[in-house]
Amino acid sequence: MKKLLSVLLAFFMVFALVGCSNNEDDNNGGTTGTEDGYKVAVVTDVGQLNDGGFNQGTYEGAVAFAEKNGLSYKYYQPANGSDATDDDRIAAMRQAVEGGAEIVVTPGFLQAAALETVAKENPEVKFVFVDGWALGLDNVTAISYHEEESGFFAGYAAVMDGYTKLGGTFGGAGTNAACNRFAYGYVQGMQAAAAELDTTVEATISFLYGGSFSASTELQTQISGWYTNGTEVVFACGGSMLQSVKAAAAETENGKIIGVDTDQSAESDRVITSAFKNLSGSVDLTLTKWLEGKWDAELADQLSNLGVGDEATGLPTAEGSWRFNSFTVDQYHEVFAKVADGSIKIDSDCADLS
């Protein structure tokens, strides 16, 4: 008999609770600017620049582009960290423009209102909205990803590798479309593998402590409880939230982690894989098109929605990053090809969970 994924009651409890209803002056960095200022700027999302994930992956793409083209670059962090307001983001973006930026990369959906304000003020400056959407402005281009694909691969691979009790903690408190797609794909991947293996898998999914994408003692306590109650691997989807999951896993003998956004294998030997999206590559490509004079023809007021066909989603397969016991890279390539050619269809139509 075909077995289906069993999602624990905690999944629905979390949805009912959450889904249904000292800044420092010198917080910026980069290369030495010229008399004309910094050409390429990144205004970070909530959390730290070196978060091993979303901010860092975006910034690394901008750095790679700038360095290979001999351009100066700088990053700007909005005041108040994870509690940054739209006014804080506007101030950081204005600072980037005043510093001479000709193009500003703004990762994160929370940037939308500030980005629209500053882009309207500065029509001569170009803006790249990562994890965003078209804003109806010719000087803004947006990049989004099929996160459900990466989530699917992570859930599928974990179950195929023998894990039967999985968890996932997701940022955005149910309002972040990217995190929602990661979660939706993760559950679909687990379910597909459970059906293929004719087994039952239990999953506990939470958006409870991810509103600010930050590490917290509350999140660490929650994940510690999951591991204590038998959860074998937890998908840590939300910037610095990974640090809480790492701390909880370190208290266990065998607790494993799935990372997100970038290859997070270097963060901990407990990370068995990462639901990857090619942030650095897609940012680099977009900036290259701008430099080549293709903005008006290919980027102005456009949304680039990237996935397996663009090699923008998936799992990292480098030797040190692949830490499954029995599920092989060849098996992964087989299921990747089936998603790419449409043999396996992954639903992306998940509602806002707020």
Task: Report the location of each language-model feature.
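A residue-level marker of the well-folded mature domains of exported/periplasmic proteins
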Residues: C20-N22, N27-S354
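Sec-dependent N-terminal signal peptides of Gram-positive bacterial secreted proteins and lipoproteins
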Residues: K2-N22
